[in-house]
A protein has these predicted regions:
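P-loop NTPase catalytic phosphate-binding loop
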Residues: 1-158
Length: 158
């Protein structure tokens, strides 16, 4: 991109790729998906009050290696991270996806009637619903039960 300066001098600079944030739903397949997940996680943590946030971290392939940067946060007993750990085992991943599905199902049926979405509800109501964010790496390694709940959750994100 070229910009004309005040004195007529041309300046050239690059802009990074920009993703809308927070996205309603974001799914990406890329060889650097771990880096992308880390960047989005850091962006979320720096832009959202932690008392209004719950993050579910799933690394089904590398035993939590994708989220190594979060390990220091996990040591601090931060309750905004689901179970205060990076989920790597099939059963705990399935339970987390089931938990997220139940949360979405209950809130969509009970609290969000008459509202456009969670953001619209939180703008109007005094008891805002926390933002739930799922960071998932290794979809191919998920069990069939976990995939079932992932598909159920995905239906809410569309």
């Amino acid at each position: 991109m070229e910009i004309k300066g005040k004195n007529g001098a041309d300046m050239e600079f690059c802009l990074p790729k920009v993703y809308p944030f927070p996205p309603k739903s974001l799914y990406i397949e890329h060889e650097k998906d771990g880096q992308f997940l880390r960047e989005m996680l850091m962006r979320l943590l720096s832009s959202t009050p932690l008392v209004q946030l719950e993050v579910i971290l799933v690394d089904a392939l590398s035993l939590g290696g994708i989220f190594n940067l979060v390990r220091r946060i996990l040591d601090k007993d931060n309750d905004f991270i689901y179970q205060q750990k990076i989920l790597t085992e099939s059963e705990e991943i399935k339970e987390a996806l089931k938990y997220l599905y139940e949360y979405l199902k209950v809130n969509l049926q009970e609290k969000l009637a008459g509202f456009k979405d969670f953001a619209h509800y939180n703008e109007i109501k005094e008891d805002p619903l926390p933002l739930k964010a799922l960071f998932l790496s290794g979809v191919d390694a998920l069990s069939s039960d976990a995939l079932y709940y992932l598909e159920k959750n995905h239906a809410f994100w569309l």
